[in-house]
Structures are given as C-alpha cells and as structure tokens.
Regions:
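Basic, amphipathic alpha-helical/coil surface patches used to engage anionic, phosphate-bearing ligands
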Residues: 18-344
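N-terminal chloroplast transit peptides
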Residues: 4, 8-11, 15-21
C-alpha cells in the first residue's frame, strides 16, 4: 500500500469510523465530532498525515517489529547457549555482559542477525552512554515528574496522576525499588497520554528516562520475588494506556519514531501485553491502518476497549488473568478521577 493510499484510508476511516466494529464498545455521540475534526480540520489532517508518514517508513517498521513482542517460554537451545558462552568469553571484560543472566542475553541471541558478540558489545556501549546510573534517583517516575511538572499538560479528568506509573500494591512502595505487580510475569505500567505535552521534553531525555526504567524491568525485576503476586517475573512489561483526557493534541508520532527503534533494539522482546482504553473512533481508524502494516504477532498483543464500561471490563480481564490483588491495584488508577475517587 502506498503512502497516499494509507492517508486516504485514514481520512475515510475517520469519516466512516462509526461503522467500524469495537470490542465491548458502545460509542458516545462525541465520537462523531472527533471523527469529523480528524477528517476535515487542518490540525486533524496534519496529525493524520504525521501518522501516515510514520506508518509509511519501511525502515522504521522493519526496525521495531521483529523484536517487539515478548518471547514464548521455549528454553534456550544448545546452540544458543553455546553462542552466549562464546560471547561471554570474547567480552570477558564487559561489566554489563558479565552481570546479565543467560535469559537476558538470550533475547539478543534470538533478535536475529549474525555475530552475537558484536551486538552485545554494541548494546553494552549504548547502555553505558544512554542509561543513567542505577543509583541516580532523579529518574524515578515520582521525582522526575515532580521536577518537570510544568512540562506536562493539565488534565482535570486525570487530576494529579502522573504521565507514567508502575503499578504497586502499596502506595508507600511508589518511587522505590520494589518490583511492580506482575501480569503473567511482566511488570505492569500505566501510561497516560492525556498528560503529554508535545515538545516540552526532548527525545534524548525521554530515552534516558525510559531506558533507566527498562533496565530495571528487564533485569533486576526479572529475578527473585517478594510475594505470591510478584513471583514469576520474566523481564517483560505490560502496558495499560489510559487515554482518559487524550486527544489528537497529545499524539506524538515524531517522538515514537525517535524512541522505538532504540528501545526495541536494546530491550528486545520486552512487550508482553498492551491494553489501550478508552478508544474513540479516531484512534480506531488509525488502528485499522496499523493492523495492515504490523504483523499479527505484534497486533495480537494489543487489546482495545471502549464504551462506558471499559474500566469494569479491563479490571475484570486483569482479575481473570492474575487475580484480585492486581485488579484491585489497577482499578483506582484508571479512568476519570471523579469516577474512581482517587487522584494518586
């Protein structure tokens, strides 16, 4: 499909999005206005053109799709273990390689390409250059967002909830080293794009922030455990993208294009699941094109929810997947604050 065809499809999809099927969805009347704005307004068409440019960039798509979704539970083969052992010998003076488990290095062995040693050396150099020191607590979400409060959009529907938040059972654990609650072995993270202000924080800072947390999620938090709901960590992440208060003004395709290639290359196979809600017709229209571009093994990791009952549906799905402790921690953190009674 050509770039022009994709853009045309995006515009048509927005104009006719009320006819598209939703999972568990009952569409609010405001979606008609959102679809019309996206399809006809100057700002809406500009944003869709940016999305189209992103989806039309073959090198970008090829750089993120091979190693985006998490691996299965297949044990390492003899050949893979031999390659890892050989790389360890060649990189015997590399601190990151020496401190990484075989499970961590296995992700790179399976990420494709020849010369595992060279690829491990490259990601080790990237880590030493990009990721801040582990003990630099300024990169904790709580501290980072407090220090940069003026660089995020005010969103009454979200109250004081931060742009990103690890889900932990006890509020007093927030900002510390305690491992987040696990969803099928993956650390659970909430992302709230309604707080995003495009351009307020540069891409390099975003990369350093996410990489600092990614190193913990894929390394330290994959080992050990401190209770029944925290056992079984496998070094992956599951996202809840709470789109409460979000609109086209918060969407930042340019930032995604800057961040995703580096993150998927240096944290391969790290996405376990992603829940995105509430979805309006504009997002669904974009997603209808995304599904044509990305392989099904990637899009299958995403669950899209909409309608007035999306919070209850998501909470119940999480309860069925990993129990009431995780579901009870998630429920007061998603949706408008006036509905949940929480601003934390």
């Amino acid at each position: 499909m050509t770039a022009g065809a994709r853009l045309t499809l995006l515009l048509l999809a927005c104009a006719h999005a009320l006819k598209l099927p939703f999972r568990r969805a009952s569409l609010p009347a405001s979606d008609k206005r959102a679809a019309a704005e996206a399809a006809t307004s100057t700002a809406g068409r500009k944003k869709l053109a940016q999305v189209n440019e992103l989806l039309s960039d073959g090198s970008f798509i090829d750089s993120i799709t091979p190693s985006l979704p998490s691996l299965g539970g297949d044990a390492a083969t003899k050949e893979e273990l031999a390659a890892i052992a050989a790389a360890r010998v060649e990189l015997s003076d590399d601190n990151w390689v020496a401190s990484s488990s075989d499970d961590v290095l296995l992700r790179f062995a399976r990420a494709g390409g020849d010369n595992l040693t060279a690829r491990l050396a490259a990601t080790s150099e990237w880590r030493s250059r990009v990721i801040p020191p582990t003990d630099d607590r300024a990169w904790e979400f709580e501290r980072f967002f407090a220090a940069n409060r003026d660089k995020f959009s005010d969103c009454p529907e979200l109250g004081q909830r931060p742009f990103m938040e690890w889900v932990r059972a006890r509020p007093e654990d927030d900002g510390g080293d305690a491992r987040p609650l696990q969803l099928e072995g993956s650390s659970l993270l909430i992302l709230r794009p309604g707080r995003h202000r495009i351009g307020a924080i540069d891409a390099e800072t975003w990369l350093r922030l996410i990489a600092w947390h990614g190193e913990r999620a894929t390394g330290a938090w994959a080992a050990g455990g401190d209770g029944p709901v925290s056992l079984g960590g496998d070094g992956t992440v599951s996202l809840i993208v709470d789109r409460t208060g979000s609109s086209l003004r918060n969407q930042d395709p340019a930032l995604l294009k800057e961040l995703l290639p580096a993150l998927t290359q240096n944290f391969p196979f790290s996405l376990h699941k992603a829940y995105v809600a509430p979805i309006n017709v504009v997002f669904w229209a974009i997603w209808s094109v995304v599904r044509l571009v990305l392989p099904s093994r990637v899009t299958a990791r995403f669950t899209l929810l909409s309608g007035d009952g999306w919070r209850a549906a998501l909470t119940e799905e999480i309860r069925e997947t990993c129990g009431s402790v995780v579901a009870s921690a998630v429920a007061p953190r998603i949706g408008p604050v006036e509905e949940t009674g929480s601003v934390a």
